[in-house]
């Protein structure tokens, strides 16, 4: 079905709005993919907050014109599905994960931070943990010293409660008394 000029302008405006806030765009060829599989891909993309759409390449080129994603225009040939995301890795992750299980979906290229990515770079980007996972890992690393310190204080308090003086604390006192005697 062909779109009239007003419909084309509306599509370009919609995609331009998505691209304006996006961090990543990934394009993949979907030649021969079954409708049921494409529906599953769309559901996964929706769950991850990724905008996924099959577009006419000319309309997509016009939407990215003048943006950081303009370099991707040279890769926009053939039947493509466009994956656009505000999250840096979500678009690459959705497309790459689906391409692992469905050989008819072939990652073609991507663009992140104004740089065009080839298939290998998109796959590498997809293997990076999501923002939430990275934040959880950083928080975990920040809490390790605090947890170790509190365990040490708890052990010290337990020894004092038993009436024992910790060996480490007793040695410096002995050294001070020897130094005072000389």
Curated annotation (Swiss-Prot):
Entry keyword Ribosomal protein: yes
Keywords noted in UniProt: Ribonucleoprotein, Ribosomal protein, RNA-binding, rRNA-binding
MF terms (GO), sorted A to Z: large ribosomal subunit rRNA binding; structural constituent of ribosome
PROSITE patterns: RIBOSOMAL_L10
Gene Ontology biological process terms, A to Z: translation
UniProt entry tagged with the keyword GTP-binding: no
Highest rank taxon of the organism: Bacteria
InterPro entries: Ribosomal_uL10 (IPR001790), Ribosomal_uL10-like_sf (IPR043141), Ribosomal_uL10_bac (IPR022973), Ribosomal_uL10_bac_type (IPR047865), Ribosomal_uL10_CS_bac (IPR002363)
One Gene Ontology cellular component annotation held by this UniProt entry: large ribosomal subunit
Gene3D superfamilies linked to this entry: 3.30.70.1730, 6.10.250.290
Subunit text: Part of the ribosomal stalk of the 50S ribosomal subunit. The N-terminus interacts with L11 and the large rRNA to form the base of the stalk. The C-terminus forms an elongated spine to which L12 dimers bind in a sequential fashion forming a multimeric L10(L12)X complex.
Function recorded in the entry: Forms part of the ribosomal stalk, playing a central role in the interaction of the ribosome with GTP-bound translation factors.
Entries under NCBIfam families matching the protein: PRK00099.1-1
Family of the protein in this entry: Belongs to the universal ribosomal protein uL10 family.
Name the record gives this protein: Large ribosomal subunit protein uL10
Source organism (scientific name): Herminiimonas arsenicoxydans
Gene name tied to this protein: rplJ
